């Protein structure tokens, strides 16, 4: 984390103390009120500066979308088991952060997903591996994707035709998952861009 200005440190300390006391971060309005800013927009500018310096992470779309980053949290987040119906990158799913250079992968990786099962073993994605994932919904047929069907997250090869999606395994012991988009909820969470073999270095 880069050095903070006096004012930035005040904002950071306020966020940390508020989380410690209430279990949640303050809103922009609360920061502005506590520190005497003229408007929540002034608080937002300080939050952006803290994010640029690696002190916090801003979670878009939430009034309390602020997360403190400790030094060990720099790196790619590792997602473990995903609870039904919850966002993939929800804080409770993050097992840790690993110092992996995102630019090792093309396109850059945004997070790591711990693989469960052997349905993709024929292309070298094994149980316990860490799958590097680029967060996007812009994917093409034939690519390996991280998909959510209703409340379940899976890694498969994509084949989409009209209102029907087939998620194809790379293991003859598994059958394709067929999704009818007219009846089921389906979301692409990201594109698989690489694999890190599970090993003792983790």
Swiss-Prot record:
Supply the enzyme class, top level. Answer: hydrolase
Q: EC number(s) in its UniProt entry?
A: 3.4.21.88
Q: Which reaction does it catalyse?
A: Hydrolysis of Ala-|-Gly bond in repressor LexA
GO MF assignments: DNA binding; serine-type endopeptidase activity
- Keywords assigned: Autocatalytic cleavage, DNA damage, DNA repair, DNA replication, DNA-binding, Hydrolase, Repressor, SOS response, Transcription, Transcription regulation
Q: Which domain of life does this protein belong to?
A: Bacteria
Asked if the record carries the keyword Acyltransferase, the reply is no
Catalytic positions are 119, 156
For whether the record's keyword set contains DNA repair, the answer is yes
DNA-binding positions are: 28-48
Q: What sections of the sequence does the record tag as coiled-coil?
A: none
Q: Which GO terms describe its biological process?
A: DNA repair; DNA replication; negative regulation of DNA-templated transcription; proteolysis; SOS response
Q: Which InterPro entries match?
A: LexA, LexA-like, LexA/Signal_pep-like_sf, LexA_DNA-bd_dom, LexA_repressor, Peptidase_S24_LexA, Peptidase_S24_S26A/B/C, WH-like_DNA-bd_sf
Q: Where is this site: Cleavage?
A: 84-85
Assembly and oligomerization: Homodimer.
Tell me its family.
Answer: Belongs to the peptidase S24 family.
Role according to the record = Represses a number of genes involved in the response to DNA damage (SOS response), including recA and lexA. Binds to the 16 bp palindromic sequence 5'-CTGTATATATATACAG-3'. In the presence of single-stranded DNA, RecA interacts with LexA causing an autocatalytic cleavage which disrupts the DNA-binding part of LexA, leading to derepression of the SOS regulon and eventually DNA repair.
Protein's name according to its UniProt entry: LexA repressor
């Amino acid at each position: 984390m880069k050095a903070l200005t006096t004012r930035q440190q005040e904002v950071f300390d306020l966020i940390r103390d508020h989380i410690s006391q209430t279990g949640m971060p303050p809103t922009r309005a609360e920061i502005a009120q506590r520190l005497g800013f003229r408007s929540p927009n002034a608080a937002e500018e300080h939050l952006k500066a803290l994010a640029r310096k690696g002190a916090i992470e801003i979670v878009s779309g939430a009034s309390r979308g602020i997360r403190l980053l400790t030094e060990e949290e720099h790196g790619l987040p590792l997602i473990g088991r995903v609870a039904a119906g919850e966002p993939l990158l929800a804080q409770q799913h993050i097992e840790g952060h690993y110092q992996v250079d995102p630019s090792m992968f093309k396109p850059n990786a945004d997070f790591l997903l711990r693989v469960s099962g052997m349905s993709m073993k024929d292309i070298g994605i094994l149980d316990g591996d860490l799958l590097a994932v680029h967060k996007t919904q812009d994917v093409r047929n034939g690519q390996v994707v991280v998909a959510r069907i209703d409340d379940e997250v899976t890694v498969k090869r994509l084949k989409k035709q009209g209102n029907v999606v087939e998620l194809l395994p790379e293991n003859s012991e598994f059958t394709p998952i067929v999704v009818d988009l007219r009846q089921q909820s389906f979301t692409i969470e990201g594109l698989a861009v690489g694999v890190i073999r599970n090993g003792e270095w983790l």
